[in-house]
Swiss-Prot record:
NCBIfam families: IF-2, small_GTP. It comes from the Bacteria. Residues 258-274 have a biased composition (Basic residues). Residues 68-82 have a biased composition (Polar residues). Residues 52-312 are annotated as: Disordered. GTP binds at residues 406-413, 452-456, 506-509. Residues 431-435 are annotated as: G2. Residues 406-413 are annotated as: G1. Gene3D superfamilies: P-loop containing nucleotide triphosphate hydrolases, Putative DNA-binding domain, N-terminal subdomain of bacterial translation initiation factor IF2, Translation factors, Translation initiation factor IF- 2, domain 3. This is Translation initiation factor IF-2. One of its GO terms (molecular function) is GTPase activity. Belongs to the TRAFAC class translation factor GTPase superfamily. Classic translation factor GTPase family. IF-2 subfamily.
């Protein structure tokens, strides 16, 4: 640090040098102009000057004034302003030096006491820890002794319990035997008593019959005399006849009651405590049962009411397709289009009569208007054609379908040529030039089908169309080169398709071959050898010398055996298009790999947008064949056009229906393509949400250096939450290639380039598939845009915000709206057509909508604080004086990724 001289200090405090030298001398510090000044000397000079010129003031007073304007309401709705001035005074007193020293000494003593207390606490804690350890040791010894005693007691109890259980079982067996003997004696006694009762009943009945025969004559004379007495007195006779009729009727009632009560008991619940009603109901039922014919009908007709139910609105069965216009929906329901538009407005959707609405919206509107809805799928014809097929029931093992992938010049073609030349049957017409993109080889352990596809284009395009044709991927890596960029791309494609990988380490016969280096490099990309605990087989081969080819084929068959590949051999065939082209003399030609069933010459096939009858079939040798089973590639002729690679091939029954399905698919192709383009847009990813599932943002990342790739990948993966996850489908160093674009199209991913650009072929794929391609040079911009896309996929948070409060002062009736509350707005603003709550004693008693809002008989949209208004609550009339009406609105708060 530079020393401060007297001259520089004088310049700093703006005083002459001679005067400053004199002041130093007066303070007892002799100095010259060029001498240095220390901080201690500055303090000494300052203290000298304070003593000489007087000390600093003991008090300091500060004053502050603030002015504001207050607006208060006046009469007539006007307001006036009042000026308010607030004055504040604050005095600061300098502390006495002796008092300061005393306070400092007290603070020092307090700190020392706290330190002493802390040291004592530490000592106490140590002693307590030692005592606690001793107690725990003693308790542990005691617990061990108790546990041993309990185990001994448990062993004794177990032995005694076994003896007790044996005694209990013996006692239970004896008890069951005694109970069975008692039950047998009781049954015999009941049978004897029943027999005696039946004999007594027969004896009484015989005596009654005999007495009736003996007294029959006496009873007849008495009845005759009684009839002559009745004729003498008409009134007595009439009353007696009436009583007899009533008695006879009562006997009928009593007789029928026992029969009808059981039948009506379950259907008619009986009320307790109302005996009169019960007996009356029983009497009515018994009389109805006793009368027959006309009486029963007359009773039913007399109880029938004359009121007839009014006719209901006609409920129709409405068939709705995937899309429908509002006008067509109205015609199907036989109502006016304005009624449908009104119903949609009630549901919160605005539409015109010619607007196309989706199936779900149309279903909601039709059901809201009381009609029954039947949903019709547009692809019913396609489903009917696909379901009308003969398929065999028994599945058999099939040959694996293998795709060979790898970097350029690593020996893919040489490996294929060697396998073809040694394993394919001799007599191939024209040699290699006759192959059709796929061939199969026969080995001692089984058959293998190889797809001879250039690069990864066909592999990825088939996966993009949903056709999983490949079972196993053979990754060819040169032992002298190791892992190269296209090797990494092949690994990413295989992982995205979830296909097992068998690694063929080629050029093993070269001197610079390093097998361990290849294993180490591949393990960094998730391809672990079996000897390292992974799942991938590493086979050293040489396509030039033929070393290890048989081991490679056996490894493929072993992997296929683990996968348990099976297919139905009989029935109509189905498969996938490997490649297709237009031949000048033969027309559209397609190479088909059969997956299930048997493809025969003359079958009618449906292939994507094309259809036709198989006029000819050729195998990979160029020979005519009549049929092809599972995992067999063939070349077929007879299609109406050239299909796309990866299209599904299906054999159907009817050529006419196949043509209709093909035309329907052509019409739907544009809609599907637009939907896929819209789905892959970064800004529209929030529209692809479904409640209750985890959303994914798929990214294909390319950067200029490996460090940038790793940094960006880590940053993107850290953005993942429980609701939205970032998935890196593929990443690498270098420009964006056609393979990257095809991978992004197959995975519905966005392409991100960091300091790199796309080549011409990649731009062509990006334009044709309308992929979302982003270029960045700043990593923070990349992270922010992906974070914004993820935030758009989060569902918004709904929040209720109270905007106004009104107090009910009076209630009056309106013929149009019912009860109208005369209110004074006490807080905020009351807005029309907003949801409200009615509060009574600070308790919510109703929640609904504000229907009418008036001020001085004029309809208004809002009423502000301090004004009176009339409020009509929709569908609610129980408004009382003193209630509070709370108006609120629901706002959506967009969530974001933190």
């Amino acid at each position: 640090m530079t020393d401060v001289t007297v001259k520089s200090l004088a310049t700093e405090i703006q005083t002459p040098v001679e005067r400053l030298v004199q002041q130093f001398a007066d303070a007892g510090i002799p100095k010259a102009a060029d001498d240095s000044v220390t901080a201690q000397e500055k303090q000494t000079l300052l203290a000298h000057l304070n003593r000489e010129h007087g000390s600093t003031p003991d008090k300091l007073t500060l004053q502050r004034k603030t002015r504001s304007t207050l607006s208060i309401p006046g009469t007539g709705g006007k307001s006036k302003s009042v000026q308010i001035e607030v004055r504040k005074t604050r005095t600061f007193v300098k502390r006495d030096p002796q008092e300061a020293e005393r306070l400092a000494a007290e603070e020092q003593a307090q700190r020392e006491a706290e330190e002493q207390a802390q040291r004592e606490a530490v000592e106490t804690a140590k002693r307590e820890a030692v005592l606690k350890a001793e107690r725990e040791a003693a308790e542990k010894a005691k617990r061990d002794a108790n546990d041993k005693a309990k185990r001994d007691a448990a062993e004794k109890d177990k032995v005694s319990n076994q003896q007790t259980d044996e005694m209990t079982k013996t006692a239970q067996t004896e008890k069951a035997r005694r109970e069975n003997e008692a039950a047998e004696l009781k049954r015999k006694a009941e049978e004897e008593a029943r027999r005696k009762l039946e004999e007594d009943a027969r004896r009484v009945a015989e005596e009654a019959r005999r007495m009736a025969e003996e007294n029959a004559g006496v009873w007849a004379e008495q009845e005759k005399a009684k009839g002559e007495e009745d004729k003498t007195d008409y009134h007595v006779t009439t009353s007696q006849h009436a009583r007899q009729a009533e008695d006879e009727n009562d006997r009928e009632v009593e007789g029928n009651r026992s029969r009808t009560r059981t039948a009506t008991k379950a259907a008619r619940p009986q009320k307790k405590g109302n005996k009169h009603a019960e007996s009356k109901a029983d009497r009515e039922e018994a009389r109805a049962a006793g009368r027959g014919g006309k009486g029963g009908k007359r009773k039913g007709s007399s109880l029938q009411q004359g009121f007839q139910k009014p006719a209901q609105a006609v409920n129709r069965d409405v068939v709705i397709g995937e899309t429908i216009t509002v006008g067509d929906l109205a015609n199907k329901m036989a109502v006016k289009g304005s009624q449908v538009i009104k119903a949609m407005m009630k549901l919160g959707a605005m539409a015109t009569i010619n607007q196309v609405i989706d199936q779900e919206t149309a279903q909601l509107v039709a059901e809201e208007m009381g009609h029954k809805v039947t949903l019709r799928r547009e692809n019913e014809l396609e489903e009917a054609v696909m379901s009308d097929r003969d398929t065999g029931a028994a599945a058999e093992s099939r040959a694996p379908v293998v795709t060979i992938m790898g970097h350029v010049d690593h020996g893919k073609t040489s490996l294929l040529d060697y396998i073809r030349s040694t394993k394919v049957a001799s007599g191939e017409a024209g040699g290699i030039t006759q192959h059709i993109g796929a061939y199969h080889v026969e080995t001692d352990n089984g058959m293998i089908t190889f797809l001879d596809t250039p690069g990864h284009a066909a592999f990825t395009s088939m996966r993009a169309r949903g056709a999983q044709a490949t079972d196993i991927v053979v990754l060819v890596v040169a032992a002298d080169d190791g892992v190269m960029p296209q090797t990494i791309e092949a690994i990413q494609h295989a992982k995205a398709a979830q296909v097992p990988v068998v690694v063929a380490v080629n050029k093993i016969d070269k001197p610079e071959a390093d097998m361990d280096r290849v294993k180490t490099e591949l393990s960094q990309y998730g391809v672990m050898p079996e000897e390292w605990g992974g799942e991938s087989q590493f086979i050293p081969v040489s396509a030039k010398a033929g070393t290890g080819i048989d081991d490679l084929l056996n490894a493929i068959l072993l992997q296929a055996e683990v996968l348990e590949l099976k297919a139905v051999r009989n029935g109509m065939a189905s498969g996938a298009v490997i490649e297709s082209f237009l031949d000048k003399g033969r027309g559209p030609v397609a190479t088909v790999l059969v997956r299930e069933g048997t493809l025969n010459k003359g079958d009618i096939v449906l292939c994507g947008f094309e259809y036709g009858r198989v006029r000819a079939m050729r195998n990979e040798l160029g020979q005519e064949v009549l049929e092809a089973g599972p995992s067999i590639p063939v070349e077929i002729l007879g299609l109406s056009g050239v299909p796309a690679a990866g299209d599904e091939v299906t054999v159907v029954r009817d050529e006419k229906k196949a043509r209709e399905v093909a035309l329907y698919r052509q019409g739907k192709f544009r809609e599907v393509k637009l939907a896929r383009q819209q789905k892959s847009k970064l800004e529209n990813m929030f529209a692809n949400m479904t409640d209750g599932e985890v959303h994914e943002v798929n990214v294909v990342l390319k950067a200029d250096v490996q460090g940038s790739v790793e940094a960006i990948s880590d940053s993107l993966l850290k953005l993942s939450t429980d609701e939205v996850k970032v998935k890196i489908i593929g990443s690498g160093v270098g420009g964006i290639t056609e393979t990257d674009a095809t991978l992004a199209a197959a995975s519905n991913a966005i392409l991100v380039g960091f300091n790199v650009r796309a080549d011409a072929s990649a731009r062509k794929v990006i334009d044709s598939e309308s992929l979302d391609l982003r270029y960045y040079s700043v990593i923070y911009h990349l992270i922010d845009e992906v974070k914004a896309a993820m935030s758009g996929m989060l569902s918004p948070e709904l929040k209720q915000q109270i905007i106004g409060l009104a107090e009910v002062r009076d209630v009056f009736k309106s013929p149009k709206f019912g009860a109208i509350a005369g209110c004074m707005v006490t807080e905020g603003t009351i807005k029309r057509h907003n949801p409200i709550r009615v509060l009574r004693d600070n308790v919510v008693i109703y929640e609904g909508e504000l229907e009418s809002l008036r001020r001085f008989k004029d309809d208004v949209n809002e009423v502000r604080n301090g004004m009176e208004c009339g409020i009509g609550v929709k569908n609610y009339n129980d408004v009382r004086v003193g209630d509070m009406i709370e108006v609120f609105e629901i706002i959506e708060i967009q969530r974001s990724i933190a």
